[in-house]
A protein has these predicted regions:
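The feature encodes a structural signal of leucine-rich repeats
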Residues: 76-81, 98-103, 119-123, 139-143, ...
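Conserved hydrophobic beta-strand positions in leucine-rich repeat
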Residues: 64-68, 89-91, 111-113, 120, ...
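Short, non-transmembrane alpha-helical segments in secretory-pathway proteins
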Residues: 21-33
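LRR flanking "cap" motifs
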Residues: 30-78
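Leucine-rich solenoid repeat scaffolds
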Residues: 390, 395-442
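Leucine-rich repeat
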Residues: 59-63, 82-87, 104-109, 124-129, ...
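Bacterial Sec-dependent N-terminal signal peptides
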Residues: 1-20
Length: 442
């Protein structure tokens, strides 16, 4: 009898809790004009809450997740915080517009808010770990007192032009920050000392102070036309840097001795000081660099330095090099004899009169377009699949031994004769002038 009473009381308590959570969800439905939702299956019904569209419950029937993507209009009711077990809230407002004050949600760990979010305040969520938001109006965005926050993603609305300041308060556990298309004149993250990964894309930043980010390992800052100077000298743990598509004239990475990946493509750099013997990939294409010293980078596998002002390039110490693009510089010679692992070479648009490929037996792709090269010996390059000699001065070429070749381009070149194998048939990607003659090599 005693145990029966206990069981009965427990069931009544659970029933009462479910009724309470049911009433909270009903108020949520009415506050956001749920009658206009496209998907509202079982909402306001007597069915278990986990059968309501977008609602997930635990084994006791308590709401742990709300995930809705629909037309919503109104303000999320404050009583939603009384869903004591709610851990995940994801709202994608596809039309309409909603306002939220996420304050004192006791168990909330993940918050995802996208679409027409007109106002967003997030405060005093002691368990919140991840926040991803695309508020329509960042003037009405505020976040504070979320001590467990480790991931923050913010994305601005399309075609936004009004610049704003984003000042992040202290988040001691914040390790990853993503900001996309948010038009900023200033970004203050000096109080986020544990940041390890930063991704800032198309934000029109004019300056970025990362002096307090000593734990930073990954940095991507791209698409900021007004960013001219970037000092990363205190970010000594950086492993990967992508600062492509800015207007950087000064880049300080002198203390980044753990760096393995650097992409500074499409900036306005005239010099680049590198100091990491671990560097595997370097992309400094489309800058104004006149001197590039890579002699100490024995781990370098990928080098992209095309579109600069280089008059010389010494890669003799880079014996692990696999990919090289150095086109459209001022190079008059290029020595690749020590780079036997190269499978990709693009060296067109230079002043090269010749190039020795006798040691490049792994070569699969070769391009010397718009080049004064007159002779090209490919006898050692039996793995070649692609050849581009567009606009070159080569008159004769032997491809009779290249059984893997599927792409050949020689438009606007001086080419007159191609030596081919006995059973040769032109491939689909065969681009030559009409007066070029193919001769069979016996």
């Amino acid at each position: 009898m005693k145990y029966s009473i206990i069981i009965l009381i427990t069931q009544l308590l659970l029933w009462g809790c479910c009724r309470s959570e049911r009433s909270i969800l009903k108020s949520f439905y009415k506050a956001l004009d749920g009658d206009k939702w496209e998907h509202k299956e079982n909402w306001l019904s007597d069915k278990p809450l986990n059968e309501w569209y977008g609602i997930t419950t635990d084994e006791k029937g308590k709401v742990v997740k709300i995930q809705l993507s629909d037309t919503m209009t109104g303000k999320v009711p404050a009583n939603l915080k009384h869903l004591k077990k709610l851990q995940s809230l994801h709202l994608d407002c596809m039309a309409g517009g909603i306002r939220l004050e996420v304050n004192n949600y006791p168990s909330l760990k993940e918050l995802g808010l996208h679409g027409y979010i007109n106002q967003l305040t997030v405060e005093n969520c002691s368990e919140l770990e991840k926040l991803s938001a695309t508020p329509k109006y960042f003037d009405n965005f505020h976040i504070d007192h979320c001590p467990q926050l480790s991931f923050l993603e913010l994305e601005g609305p399309p075609f936004e032009t009004i610049k704003k300041t984003l000042d992040l308060p202290s988040f001691p556990k914040l390790s990853e920050l993503k900001i996309h298309r948010l038009v900023l004149d200033q970004l203050h993250i000096n109080n986020c000392f544990n940041l390890k990964k930063i991704n800032i894309y198309d934000c029109q930043l004019e300056e970025l102070n990362l002096s307090s980010c000593a734990n930073l390992e990954y940095l991507k800052v791209s698409g900021n036309d007004s960013l001219h100077i970037l000092d990363l000298s205190r970010c000594v743990k950086l492993d990967s840097i992508d600062v492509s598509r800015n207007s950087i004239t000064q880049l300080n990475i002198s203390n980044c001795k753990k760096l393995r990946y650097l992409n500074c493509y499409f900036n306005k750099l005239s010099e680049l000081e590198l100091n990491s013997s671990l560097l595997c990939t370097l992309n400094c294409s489309d800058n104004e660099i006149s001197k590039l010293d890579v002699t100490n980078f024995k781990e370098l596998k990928h080098l992209y330095c095309d579109g600069n002002n280089l008059s010389e390039l010494d890669i003799s110490k880079c014996e692990k090099l696999e990919q090289l693009t150095c086109g459209f510089n001022n190079l008059s010679e290029l020595n690749v004899r020590q780079n036997s692992k190269l499978y990709f070479i693009e060296c067109g648009g230079n002043n090269l009169q010749s190039i020795d490929l006798s040691k490049n037996q792994e070569l699969e792709d070769f391009c010397c377009e718009d080049s004064p090269i007159k002779e090209l010996d490919l006898s050692s390059c039996t793995k070649l699949e692609r050849i581009n000699i567009y606009g070159s001065q080569i008159t004769t070429i032997d491809i009779s031994h290249l059984n893997k070749l599927y792409y050949f381009k020689a438009y606007r070149s001086s080419l007159k004769t191609i030596w081919v194998s006995k059973n040769f048939e032109p491939m689909d990607m065969w681009f030559i002038e009409d007066d070029v003659v193919c001769k069979t090599k016996q």
